[in-house]
Amino acid sequence: MVPEPGPVNSSTPAWGPGPPPAPGGSGWVAAALCVVIVLTAAANSLLIALICTQPALRNTSNFFLVSLFTSDLMVGLVVMPPAMLNALYGRWVLARGLCLLWTAFDVMCCSASILNLCLISLDRYLLILSPLRYKLRMTAPRALALILGAWSLAALASFLPLLLGWHELGKARTSAPGQCRLLASLPYVLVASGVTFFLPSGAICFTYCRILLAARKQAVQVASLTTGTATAGQALETLQVPRTPRPGMESADSRRLTTKHSRKALKASLTLGILLSMFFVTWLPFFVASIAQAVCDCISPGLFDVLTWLGYCNSTMNPIIYPLFMRDFKRALGRFVPCVHCPPEHRASPASPSMWTSHSGARPGLSLQQVLPLPLPPNSDSDSASGGTSGLQLTAQLLLPGEATRDPPPPTRAPTVVNFFVTDSVEPEIRQHPLGSPMN
């Protein structure tokens, strides 16, 4: 985070003589800031412990979440407490040597949080847009390399310019006694803001908009599938030859399935809208004010402190918003914390996708399972019911994201299921049986 370009001409602020003054803020301000600090530290610590202790959550996708929660935890433990003292006392009350160090950690932790949000959006983008290639592209070493790159960029944008004095270029202002408001020139503010906010936020908008378009396209494709001549159930469509069609049931089930996918597309739109709104509401005012302050010096210290804490609150909301839309996090939290309600687990195919599940496997939006049982014996019960050997039975399963499917009618013979969307599935064993011979 870029500190406020306050009225100082050195990275070492001036302190007035005597003991620190009494807090100038009211009691409710101190209480509110303490609640924000405790909630930030507790929520991020809980989710880090949850991922580390639950085997179901230890996967490549959650590497980025651990990095995000770590940066937000550092904001709550290292950045917020001195900032609270600064806001309450109106001056820097800690050791003067800690001012520059605290400012550097402020920039690094907040920048790392924003860059980790960008990595999470990239991970979701690859998972939804290229689910079959996700495991090949997003391996554990590549994920760790991306995380290391994000933290390195955040450190370079914070410690290096401050230690070398690049933030003071072109500035000549009188110092304010007792203040720890770092001098920042317009070039430094523009470069730091562009690298740590505007470029990552553009990438976040691009990836989430592509995900939203993919969700809507999937809903349209499913709706077009339900308008075919085949009988579409709510989650199971069975084509059997011969079979008597029932047009009334076709149209009703098709409308029901289309409506459900339309609702899911709308829910995905609202989810992305909430995430993007929270991100820009918390951080955009701060960076706009930073640029305005560097240009015209027209932002009061009180208003800048409010905008700074608004950006800090993004680290409080991240551990609440992101797991809120992840079902596996809810179930793991229910097992980890007994008082938390654990939603029931749905039986879903490993190929079923969800933007907000943290599994790293490839899971496309539509799972089609082809079931090809061999011809049944002439004296089987199915022949007497259908009037002859049924020959070929095709089962196409439309699996909605994150939902359980209805159990199909029990087959007369156990079919061989081939899932074409699971890359590491075992090859099925094919055996030949002559027509009319019994199968084991």
From Swiss-Prot:
What's an example Gene Ontology biological process for this entry?
positive regulation of TOR signaling
Residues the record marks as carrying a glycan: N9
What the entry lists under Pfam families is as follows:
7tm_1
Which GO MF terms does the UniProt record name?
G protein-coupled serotonin receptor activity; serotonin receptor activity
Cytoplasmic topological segments: 53-62, 123-142, 210-268, 326-440
Here the disulfide bonds are C99-C180
Kindly list the positions annotated as binding serotonin: D106
Q: Which residues lie on this side of the membrane: Extracellular?
A: 1-27, 89-96, 168-185, 296-301
User: Which locations, inside or outside the cell, does it occupy?
Assistant: Cell membrane
List keywords of the entry alphabetically. Cell membrane, Disulfide bond, G-protein coupled receptor, Glycoprotein, Membrane, Receptor, Transducer, Transmembrane, Transmembrane helix
What's in the GO CC field? cilium; plasma membrane
**InterPro entries noted in UniProt:** 5HT6_rcpt, GPCR_Rhodpsn, GPCR_Rhodpsn_7TM
Report if keyword Transferase is assigned: no
Bilayer-crossing regions: 28-52, 63-88, 97-122, 143-167, 186-209, 269-295, 302-325
Topology of this chain in the membrane? Multi-pass membrane protein
Cited Gene3D superfamilies = Rhodopsin 7-helix transmembrane proteins
Functional summary from the UniProt entry: G-protein coupled receptor for 5-hydroxytryptamine (serotonin), a biogenic hormone that functions as a neurotransmitter, a hormone and a mitogen. Also has a high affinity for tricyclic psychotropic drugs. Ligand binding causes a conformation change that triggers signaling via guanine nucleotide-binding proteins (G proteins) and modulates the activity of downstream effectors. HTR6 is coupled to G(s) G alpha proteins and mediates activation of adenylate cyclase activity. Controls pyramidal neurons migration during corticogenesis, through the regulation of CDK5 activity.
Q: How does it assemble?
A: Interacts with CDK5. Interacts with MTOR. Interacts with RPTOR and NF1.
Q: What is known of its domains?
A: Specificity for G(s) G alpha proteins is determined by the length of transmembrane regions 5 and 6 (TM5 and TM6).
What family classification does the UniProt entry report for this protein? Belongs to the G-protein coupled receptor 1 family.
Q: What is this protein called?
A: 5-hydroxytryptamine receptor 6
- What lineage does UniProt assign to this protein's organism? Eukaryota, Metazoa, Chordata, Craniata, Vertebrata
Gene coding for it: Htr6
